[in-house]
Amino acid sequence: LPQLLYHIQWKFRDELRPRFGVMRCREFFMKDAYSFDFNDEDALHSYNKFYLSYLRTFNRLQLSAIPMTADTGPIGGNLSHEFIIIAETGESKIYTDKRIFNVDFRNTDVDHKSLNELRNKFETFYAATDEKFNAANFDKNVSKQYKLVTKGIEVGHIFYFGDKYSKPMNA
Protein backbone atom coordinates (compact mmCIF):
# COMPACT_ATOMS: atom_id res chain seq x y z
CA LEU A 1 0.00 0.00 0.00
CA PRO A 2 -0.82 2.61 -1.14
CA GLN A 3 -2.45 1.33 -4.31
CA LEU A 4 -4.42 3.29 -6.89
CA LEU A 5 -6.93 1.42 -9.00
CA TYR A 6 -8.65 2.97 -11.99
CA HIS A 7 -12.06 2.03 -13.38
CA ILE A 8 -12.66 3.55 -16.80
CA GLN A 9 -15.67 2.62 -18.92
CA TRP A 10 -18.77 3.85 -20.67
CA LYS A 11 -21.66 4.37 -18.26
CA PHE A 12 -25.33 4.59 -19.03
CA ARG A 13 -28.00 6.33 -16.99
CA ASP A 14 -31.65 5.56 -17.44
CA GLU A 15 -32.94 9.02 -16.53
CA LEU A 16 -35.96 10.79 -17.90
CA ARG A 17 -33.84 13.92 -18.27
CA PRO A 18 -30.04 14.18 -18.24
CA ARG A 19 -28.74 16.19 -15.29
CA PHE A 20 -25.88 18.63 -14.82
CA GLY A 21 -25.42 19.73 -18.42
CA VAL A 22 -23.03 17.89 -20.72
CA MET A 23 -21.41 15.87 -17.94
CA ARG A 24 -24.49 13.77 -17.13
CA CYS A 25 -26.02 12.70 -20.38
CA ARG A 26 -27.56 9.26 -20.87
CA GLU A 27 -24.24 7.84 -21.96
CA PHE A 28 -20.89 9.13 -20.74
CA PHE A 29 -17.31 8.06 -20.21
CA MET A 30 -16.68 7.57 -16.48
CA LYS A 31 -13.16 7.72 -15.12
CA ASP A 32 -13.10 6.55 -11.51
CA ALA A 33 -10.04 6.10 -9.33
CA TYR A 34 -9.81 4.41 -5.95
CA SER A 35 -6.95 4.63 -3.47
CA PHE A 36 -6.24 1.93 -0.92
CA ASP A 37 -4.09 3.24 1.91
CA PHE A 38 -2.48 1.92 5.06
CA ASN A 39 -4.20 4.30 7.51
CA ASP A 40 -6.58 7.27 7.73
CA GLU A 41 -3.79 9.84 7.46
CA ASP A 42 -2.49 8.30 4.23
CA ALA A 43 -6.04 7.99 2.86
CA LEU A 44 -6.65 11.71 3.48
CA HIS A 45 -3.35 12.45 1.77
CA SER A 46 -4.55 10.50 -1.28
CA TYR A 47 -7.86 12.41 -1.15
CA ASN A 48 -6.00 15.71 -1.09
CA LYS A 49 -3.80 14.66 -4.02
CA PHE A 50 -6.92 14.00 -6.09
CA TYR A 51 -8.30 17.37 -4.91
CA LEU A 52 -5.19 19.12 -6.26
CA SER A 53 -5.22 16.99 -9.43
CA TYR A 54 -8.71 18.18 -10.31
CA LEU A 55 -7.71 21.82 -9.76
CA ARG A 56 -4.59 21.46 -11.91
CA THR A 57 -6.38 19.55 -14.68
CA PHE A 58 -9.09 22.16 -15.11
CA ASN A 59 -6.54 24.97 -14.81
CA ARG A 60 -4.63 23.46 -17.77
CA LEU A 61 -7.91 23.56 -19.70
CA GLN A 62 -8.21 27.25 -18.70
CA LEU A 63 -11.26 26.53 -16.58
CA SER A 64 -11.75 27.64 -12.99
CA ALA A 65 -13.15 24.73 -11.02
CA ILE A 66 -14.57 25.64 -7.62
CA PRO A 67 -14.18 22.91 -4.99
CA MET A 68 -17.31 22.70 -2.84
CA THR A 69 -17.98 20.52 0.15
CA ALA A 70 -20.67 18.11 -0.98
CA ASP A 71 -23.10 15.61 0.45
CA THR A 72 -21.83 12.05 0.15
CA GLY A 73 -25.33 10.88 -0.75
CA PRO A 74 -26.05 7.20 -1.37
CA ILE A 75 -22.37 6.54 -2.15
CA GLY A 76 -21.54 7.29 1.47
CA GLY A 77 -18.26 8.08 3.10
CA ASN A 78 -16.98 10.69 5.52
CA LEU A 79 -16.04 13.55 3.19
CA SER A 80 -16.85 14.69 -0.33
CA HIS A 81 -16.06 17.59 -2.68
CA GLU A 82 -17.65 18.50 -5.99
CA PHE A 83 -15.75 20.54 -8.55
CA ILE A 84 -18.04 23.05 -10.23
CA ILE A 85 -17.44 25.09 -13.38
CA ILE A 86 -19.51 28.26 -13.81
CA ALA A 87 -21.86 27.87 -16.78
CA GLU A 88 -25.14 29.47 -17.78
CA THR A 89 -26.36 26.01 -18.80
CA GLY A 90 -25.67 24.56 -15.36
CA GLU A 91 -28.47 23.10 -13.30
CA SER A 92 -26.81 23.70 -9.94
CA LYS A 93 -27.19 27.12 -8.42
CA ILE A 94 -23.94 28.06 -6.69
CA TYR A 95 -23.10 30.56 -3.99
CA THR A 96 -19.49 31.51 -3.45
CA ASP A 97 -17.03 34.16 -2.38
CA LYS A 98 -15.32 35.60 -5.49
CA ARG A 99 -11.99 35.62 -3.64
CA ILE A 100 -11.89 31.82 -3.95
CA PHE A 101 -10.60 32.37 -7.50
CA ASN A 102 -7.47 34.05 -6.07
CA VAL A 103 -6.24 30.95 -4.22
CA ASP A 104 -2.99 29.99 -5.93
CA PHE A 105 -2.48 26.24 -6.09
CA ARG A 106 -0.25 25.94 -9.16
CA ASN A 107 3.01 25.37 -7.26
CA THR A 108 1.57 23.40 -4.36
CA ASP A 109 3.79 20.52 -3.28
CA VAL A 110 2.17 17.11 -2.73
CA ASP A 111 3.43 16.55 0.82
CA HIS A 112 0.86 16.10 3.61
CA LYS A 113 1.27 19.58 5.10
CA SER A 114 1.07 21.52 1.81
CA LEU A 115 -2.02 19.65 0.64
CA ASN A 116 -3.83 20.10 3.97
CA GLU A 117 -3.01 23.82 3.90
CA LEU A 118 -4.30 24.10 0.34
CA ARG A 119 -7.65 22.50 1.15
CA ASN A 120 -7.93 24.68 4.26
CA LYS A 121 -7.30 27.82 2.13
CA PHE A 122 -10.14 26.92 -0.20
CA GLU A 123 -12.44 26.02 2.69
CA THR A 124 -11.97 29.46 4.31
CA PHE A 125 -14.13 30.86 1.50
CA TYR A 126 -17.84 30.16 1.35
CA ALA A 127 -18.74 27.88 -1.57
CA ALA A 128 -21.95 25.87 -1.78
CA THR A 129 -24.41 24.45 -4.25
CA ASP A 130 -28.11 24.93 -3.62
CA GLU A 131 -28.24 21.58 -1.76
CA LYS A 132 -25.78 22.79 0.91
CA PHE A 133 -26.63 26.52 0.79
CA ASN A 134 -27.16 28.29 4.12
CA ALA A 135 -28.30 31.90 3.65
CA ALA A 136 -27.31 32.96 7.18
CA ASN A 137 -23.75 31.63 6.77
CA PHE A 138 -23.42 33.16 3.30
CA ASP A 139 -24.52 36.58 4.60
CA LYS A 140 -22.33 36.31 7.69
CA ASN A 141 -19.15 35.14 5.93
CA VAL A 142 -19.22 36.97 2.58
CA SER A 143 -19.51 40.73 2.17
CA LYS A 144 -21.82 41.97 -0.58
CA GLN A 145 -18.94 42.99 -2.90
CA TYR A 146 -17.58 39.41 -2.95
CA LYS A 147 -20.84 37.48 -3.30
CA LEU A 148 -21.29 35.47 -6.46
CA VAL A 149 -24.59 33.68 -7.12
CA THR A 150 -24.73 31.92 -10.47
CA LYS A 151 -25.16 28.53 -12.14
CA GLY A 152 -22.59 25.79 -12.53
CA ILE A 153 -21.94 22.28 -13.80
CA GLU A 154 -20.38 19.50 -11.73
CA VAL A 155 -17.27 18.34 -13.58
CA GLY A 156 -15.68 16.17 -10.90
CA HIS A 157 -16.43 14.59 -7.55
CA ILE A 158 -14.17 13.00 -4.94
CA PHE A 159 -15.13 10.94 -1.90
CA TYR A 160 -13.29 9.90 1.24
CA PHE A 161 -14.77 6.53 2.14
CA GLY A 162 -12.70 5.75 5.22
CA ASP A 163 -13.11 2.03 5.88
CA LYS A 164 -16.59 1.76 4.30
CA TYR A 165 -15.44 -0.92 1.84
CA SER A 166 -12.36 -2.39 3.49
CA LYS A 167 -14.07 -3.17 6.83
CA PRO A 168 -16.81 -5.45 5.38
CA MET A 169 -14.12 -7.29 3.41
CA ASN A 170 -11.86 -7.63 6.47
CA ALA A 171 -9.11 -5.95 4.46
Predicted regions and their residues:
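TRNA-recognition modules of translation machinery and tRNA-sensing kinases, especially anticodon-binding
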Residues: 1-171
